[in-house]
Regions:
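Conserved N-terminal diphosphate/IPP-binding helix and adjacent helical/loop segment
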Residues: 1-107, 111, 115-130, 166, ...
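Acidic, Mg2+-coordinating active-site segments of isoprenoid diphosphate-utilizing enzymes
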Residues: 2-19, 61, 83-87, 111-131, ...
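C-terminal charged capping/lid subdomain of soluble metabolic enzymes
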Residues: 3, 76, 297-349
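A non-catalytic, amphipathic alpha-helix used as a structural packing/dimerization or gating element
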Residues: 42, 46, 163-166, 198, ...
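Alpha-helical scaffolds flanking conserved acidic
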Residues: 91-102, 134, 221-232, 336
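Acidic/histidine metal-binding catalytic segments
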Residues: 94, 156-169, 218-225, 277-279, ...
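Phosphate/pyrophosphate-binding betaalpha-module
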Residues: 159-165, 170, 177-179, 191-196
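A short glycine-threonine-serine/GTX helix/turn-capping micro-motif
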Residues: 188-199, 308
Length: 349
């Protein structure tokens, strides 16, 4: 059974934030983020230097890859590696290499996704597929994937290569399910959770495992960090689904809806308003969908309260992530992961 089958109170994370602020004497989230930035700045600087050392050249595959890498994402997965490693030996060279690998795998999936989805914008700029073409973007993703696997192998950290191969397999299966189910409404909730477990949560889990193993943490600590990564990944995807219905995010608004992807807001809206289902099925039966056709569906989704339900899903899994951290020793690394989890609810892109 999916780990997502049951849910805690959607308001629990708000209670947890109050607990962090009062009982533990934590500062505001803004102050926590400032502390986090100061604490990990050196680690992230070292990570970015190693990422920038990836070969550049005249070959279009390198140019397409660096087109995306140079746009600088949130680097949340590498941050997870770094923070997990801080429970033990710290952000050593082998931990740093694994952090770079996590970012390369993530970037490879974005390059491939933008081709599959015919996306035109990524991080507020034209996608690599628009600038360099679909073939170059696909080969660039392949190159980043091979570069990541090579780094993992040479890191010498036991077990992380096999785990990454499993993650990649899970990603491919999830993408296949999403492709097969595109535009199909039946079984939407079950399919949704199967897809995000493979597409998003799996790599977050790996990042936490990689950081833990690079620092030789006990098995129990690794397991707690893996659970944190899983729930953080689910929360991250839920927020991403919510942002599809907002402007000024650096992505095309309603892109998921236009591509026929049945995300959580759509799942909830269809469950709450059955009359929406035939309208949506008719719309998604067309190969291309115009913006004026999307607007009424988006309005119905918003009116159903589905965005609030999606926010509640994200809050629920942030709460679960925080619960996992209770099994780890108190200190700066745990506080930093609390901040990362809480901040994931507030992101705007």
């Amino acid at each position: 059974m999916s780990q997502l089958a049951t849910h805690a109170s959607p308001t629990a994370v708000l209670d947890r934030l109050a607990l962090v602020s009062t009982v533990r004497g934590a500062p505001s989230l803004a102050e926590r983020l400032a502390d986090l930035d100061r604490w990990v700045k050196s680690d992230l600087k070292d990570f970015e230097a190693e990422l920038d050392a990836l070969p550049r050249g005249a070959r279009v595959v390198h140019q397409a890859a660096h087109h995306l890498l140079d746009l600088r994402g949130k680097h949340l997965r590498p941050l997870c590696v770094a923070l997990a490693s801080r429970f033990g030996e710290g952000f050593t060279p082998r931990a740093r290499s694994l952090a770079v690998a996590a970012e390369l795998v993530h970037s490879a999936t974005l390059l491939h996704d933008d081709v599959v989805d015919l996306a035109e914008r990524r991080r507020g700029q034209p996608t690599a597929s628009v600038v360099y073409g679909n073939a170059a973007s696909i080969f660039a993703g392949d190159w980043l994937l091979i570069s990541a696997l090579r780094r993992i192998r040479t890191s010498g950290v036991e077990g992380v290569l096999d785990r990454m191969l499993t993650v990649i397999d899970e990603m491919i299966v999830a993408e296949s399910v999403q492709l097969e189910r595109r535009g199909k409404i039946s079984g939407a909730r079950e399919d949704y959770f199967a897809i995000i477990e493979g597409k998003t949560a799996a790599l977050f889990r790996w990042a936490m495992i990689a950081g833990a193993r690079s620092a030789d943490l006990p098995v129990a600590s690794e397991a707690a960090l893996e659970r944190f990564g899983f729930h953080l990944g689910v929360a991250f995807q839920a927020v991403d689904d919510e942002l599809d219905y907002k402007d000024n995010t650096g992505k095309d608004p309603l892109a998921d809806l236009r591509e026929g992807k049945v995300t959580f807001p759509l799942v909830v809206a269809i469950e709450r308003d059955p009359a929406l289902r035939p309208r949506l099925e008719e719309l998604l039966a067309h190969e291309t969908v115009e913006a004026d056709q999307l607007a009424p569906i988006a309005q119905a989704v918003r009116a159903s309260g589905a965005l609030q339900a999606t926010r509640a899903l994200a809050e629920d899994h942030v709460q679960r992530a925080l619960n996992a951290l209770d099994e780890l020793p108190a200190g700066a690394p745990r506080d930093a992961l609390v901040t990362v989890a809480l901040a994931s609810l507030e992101r705007q892109s």
